[in-house]
């Protein structure tokens, strides 16, 4: 077992796995990582509002890394990785329990908009439509964003004012009302994270969520090289939007020590 001390070491040990590299967060202060054989574990504090222990590799070696990382970093860290791997880890480590399944989705290139030709200039500078372009919102829009999230996505991990929730984009109606939002939040140097997606209930079904997500994802790819997100498996409508945008789905699971 060896400790990894740089992002380059994490990239090499993980084969540039986007989930693992995202968790490394550029090896910012507080992040720790280890490798054992083909297994890698990255302990990332407050990554999308959770202390996450992202893992990959052979289950037996991952179990050893998980136990070491939990001893080093504390019981708040939740192992996260491919669903089958986490299920095997829980079977082999009876002190852990399965916390839930969801999906990680990522892409390096967006699919062309439906019914439109690919636009080489579409790199986060605006996506037009009847309700207006998706665009970055001023900091002064934070109360509007918070109100829309409270009504349309109260479980959102990204909310205005949280550390590393960097910026918000939105779509407004003709009178200036905010209809849809999405955030650039907890992004890593080479993996941008899309979060905080919400559309006002009366405006749903008009493609506004897809529009604002395309805008943010395009900007993330331009800046970081790839974009990713987390989505609940039950939210089939959201999964469909992300797949239309060109995101590939990866089923993951989380585990943890009993409270």
Q: What is the predicted role of each segment?
A:
Residues 227-231:
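Conserved hydrophobic beta-strand within the GNAT/NAT acetyltransferase core sheet
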Residues 60-117, 126-136:
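Hydrophobic alpha-helical segments and helix pairs
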Residues 39-40, 176-180, 237:
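Glycine-rich acetyl-CoA-binding "A-motif" of GNAT/NAT acetyltransferases
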Residues 84-96, 210, 233-252, 259:
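Conserved active-site alpha-helix within GNAT-family acetyltransferase domains
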Residues 1-90:
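N-terminal charged segments
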Residues 1-21, 101-104, 108-156:
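Short amphipathic alpha-helix that is part of the acyltransferase structural core
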Residues 60-69, 199, 205-221, 239-244:
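Conserved acetyl-CoA-binding loop-helix of GNAT-fold acetyltransferases
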Residues 157-198:
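A conserved beta-strand-loop-helix scaffold within acyl/acetyltransferase catalytic domains
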